[in-house]
Amino acid sequence: MPISLEHVSFTYMKGTPFEKTALHDVNLQIEKGEFVAVIGHTGSGKSTLVQHLSGLLHPQKGSVCVDGVNLNAKNAAAKKARNSVGMVFQYPEHQIFAETVYEDIAFGPRNKGLTPEETDRAVKDAMAFAGLDFETFAQRSPFRLSGGQMRRVAIAGVVAMEPDYLILDEPSAGLDPRARDGIFKEIMALYCKRGIAVILVTHNM
């Protein structure tokens, strides 16, 4: 089953002099296993779109469904559907909060109800995938890492949740060419290995 948007519209500060329409009558379907790029200039509504896909924003008109479940619903099925979508924000400091890298990555698996042993395994697997050596980084503060390393922590935190859909909002923003290439290699490796859907937001090709 896909993520589907049907006739979705969203306007910021509606009814004020600063009203700005970000989405107007958008229809979109993303199947599991697809790699989709959302490309547009700054301010074109890309981030607004993917925040609807992840359930962070709700449409003012239309509907967003994940695997046939409306994300606007307030029930266990909608919560499970939202948990199947992982999102890495443009700037990792927006979603990194714990005192150590380990605790930050472990937050999601614990929230899903995994046992301590399962959580530990999920953290180690996610760190290995993201290119973060466990012994070197597990007990370090994520806020003392480089931009590229912080981005890897953010990606590892989402990967540890094992989402069916992974949204990456400008994952290479602010990174040097080497770090950018490394991030994209990891994204492609995850896509090829797990067969999840990847939605990549960018302002350039």
List each language-model region with its residue ranges.
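Hydrophobic anchor residue at the start of the ABC signature
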Residues: 155-156
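Helix-to-loop junction immediately C-terminal to a conserved catalytic motif
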Residues: 54
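ABC ATPase NBD Q-loop/coupling interface
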Residues: 63-80
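Conserved ABC ATPase signature
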Residues: 141-145, 149
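The feature captures the beta-strand-to-loop junction immediately N-terminal to the Walker
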Residues: 39-41
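Catalytic Walker B motif of ABC-type/P-loop ATPase nucleotide-binding domains
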Residues: 166-169
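Conserved catalytic motifs of ABC-family nucleotide-binding domains
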Residues: 162
